[in-house]
Amino acid sequence: MSIKGDSPSSTNASSSPKSTYSIQSDDKANLGSGNVDIRTDNSQQDSNNRRDIVVVTRVASEETLESQSSTSSMGIRPESSFNYEDASNQARVEMNNRVHGSNMNTINKYYPVRFPKNNERQLSDTNNLNEKVQGTHTVQSSTQEDKILDGDTSNSQVTPSLNIAEFPTDKLLKMLTALLTKIIKSNDRTAATNPSLTQEIENGRCLALSDNEKKYLSPVLGFRGKHVPQIGLDQYFQRIQKYCPTTNDVFLSLLVYFDRISKRCNSVTTTPKTNTAKHESPSNESSLDKANRGADKMSACNSNENNENDDSDDENTGVQRDSRAHPQMFVMDSHNIHRLIIAGITVSTKFLSDFFYSNSRYSRVGGISLQELNHLELQFLVLCDFELLISVNELQRYADLLYRFWNNAKAQSQALVTGM
């Protein structure tokens, strides 16, 4: 490392205290004269491909150095006992080469960080443990999902749990389709003997409605179509996922919103005082709980078909007697389920997802006009009372209930096949 310093006037250095800075590097440095001029060997520097320690040194005139204090601007006191100029030329060259060589050796050497043996052993053990835990967790979750999807209930201690983030969307749509299809078929069968409040109004019956009933009657009637769409729910969900793809939480939120609408609309209907306590608990029960409760009852009574038929007849009779006195306002059936799904996905995607499509795209995919979708979107918000926030625990609870329903349905189908 060598330094080139020149004053503005080389002939009269003492008259001008200003000095310039010039830094150059070379393997051989010569500090013999006041004005040092050593050029850098760029080819050698590029071939070695190494970095030099750059030391900035101020070269000034003798008068400027004498006028400075004993302490420099960097805070380093010069050694008064050693005079570099007094040394011989050979000694100066040897000292410069020794310092330069030691600096370059320090730079070129690579010293890896060494941990103590205990730390290395602990680090390796921790990495191995993390790999084992991650591998075990992945295998167990995939195995558990496959077992539940296949209807395997041999391990009763394992509680069915659905991983919302990693669960395949196509499998989730199959489960969601199975649940909604069961609810719709059940409501369609009881529509003739147990019509809902909206169906009675459509049939021309004039009923005395309260203010709360009138508040939700118009939004509920907006989703009811005159004709049943020919497309099934499985194809409808696949069409939505193909042209307007979204995440699992959006599809699961449909169950949450449908249950909220059902509880809110059916709780405001006129109920006789004698039957208020009797209908209080079922109105607060979700459709998933009812489906799972019915599935558990059917699986438990599968060995005795006669008792099952008698219980179902008694239950249907009781439901008919109670429902005549307490008609429900919001009932999901084949006439309104498609509009509820496309409106719910439109609202849920805009609220839960960072990416969503325009209403014109949703309307074309859903098979309705843009004006109708805009109207249904507003009516859906009114039915939800503009409460769209869903907590993580609530969404996970509905996902687990859906998982449990799918598990029970698979077990029932396998039991029926075995019994035949």
UniProtKB/Swiss-Prot annotation:
Keywords: Carbohydrate metabolism, Cyclin, Cytoplasm, Glycogen metabolism, Nucleus, Phosphoprotein
Keyword Ion transport: no
InterPro entries, sorted: Cyclin_PHO80-like
One Gene Ontology term, aspect cellular component: nucleus
Disulfide bonds: none
The organism's place on the tree of life at top rank: Eukaryota
Compositionally biased spans, kind Polar residues: 134-143
Biased composition (Acidic residues): 307-316
Residues recorded as bearing Phosphothreonine in the entry: T317
Renumbered residue ranges of the record's region Disordered: 1-82, 134-155, 268-321
Molecular-function GO terms, alphabetical: cyclin-dependent protein serine/threonine kinase regulator activity; protein kinase binding
Subcellular location per the Swiss-Prot or TrEMBL entry: Cytoplasm; Nucleus
Entry-annotated residues carrying Phosphoserine: S61, S281, S312
Chief subcellular location: cytoplasm
Pfam family, any one: Cyclin
Gene3D superfamilies named among the record's database cross-references: Cyclin-like
BP GO annotations: glycogen metabolic process; regulation of glycogen biosynthetic process; regulation of glycogen catabolic process
Basic and acidic residues bias spans: 277-296
Biased composition (Low complexity): 7-22
Keyword Hydrolase applies: no
Oligomeric form and interacting partners: Forms a cyclin-CDK complex with PHO85. Interacts with the substrate protein YJL084C. Interacts with elongin-C, which stabilizes PCL6. Interacts with the CDK inhibitor (CKI) PHO81.
Family from the record: Belongs to the cyclin family. PHO80 subfamily.
Anything else known: Present with 1240 molecules/cell in log phase SD medium.
Role of this protein: Cyclin partner of the cyclin-dependent kinase (CDK) PHO85. Together with cyclin PCL7, controls glycogen phosphorylase and glycogen synthase activities in response to nutrient availablility. The PCL6-PHO85 cyclin-CDK holoenzyme has GLC8 kinase activity and phosphorylates and inactivates the phosphatase PP1-2 inhibitor GLC8, causing activation of PP1-2, which then dephosphorylates and activates glycogen phosphorylase. PCL6-PHO85 also phosphorylates YJL084C.
Name of the protein in question: PHO85 cyclin-6
Species annotation: Saccharomyces cerevisiae (strain ATCC 204508 / S288c)
